Amino acid sequence: ARTGEPDSGAAGISAFVVPADAEGISYGKKEDKMGWNSQPTRLVSFDRVRVAAANRLGEEGEGFRFAMKALDGGRINIATCSLGAAQKALELSRDYLGERKQFGRELAQFQALQFKLADMATELTAARTLVRLAAFKLDEGDAEASAHCAMAKRFATDMGFEVCNQALQLHGGYGYIREYPLERLVRDTRVHQILEGTNEIMRLIIARRLLTPGMIESLA
């Protein structure tokens, strides 16, 4: 909530713990989403909600800093969700290629499909390494942790969606049928590129830090 003057910017924002049943809070209808339906989404409205000063987190004016710090962890969380979905998609693809036959041969014996599986696994491994590095930077309080979290979120969520999408392609028409889990993985991972800051915003965060003297050298 803004506790400072209207023109105080980020320095005028403070964080508070608000009881979910506080007077003045209302909740909208459950949103009918394309994916991620295991996590309900509703609009939360605050209308003249009164909160005691004792409910403030930290000092006055620290709210924006808390929010930004939470975003870094949230970005690692979303990136990890993409890793899990991509891992499952890769396993399903391996199994399907070993079971399905065309022209008297298992699909796994076709080199073009082997190459696709190899690329999916390589991208997943690279993304997992980047996410672990970002988590380490955040735990260590590294000055460039936010940039690393943005890199991990951008790469892992783009990769996660692409791996799931490629897995669906490998399954052919079966991948598009709700009886199989791949269509859900594709729908669920699509929103990862939007949550906790869109991937376009991630690129902006990264680029701004890269233009800071010494940042690029620190990546070596």
Model-derived features: positions:
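Alpha-helical interface subdomain recognition
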Residues: 43-48, 53, 59-64, 68-220
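Short glycine/proline-enriched turns and hinge-like loops at secondary-structure junctions
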Residues: 8-12, 37-39, 198
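Residues embedded in well-ordered secondary-structure elements
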Residues: 5, 33-35, 106
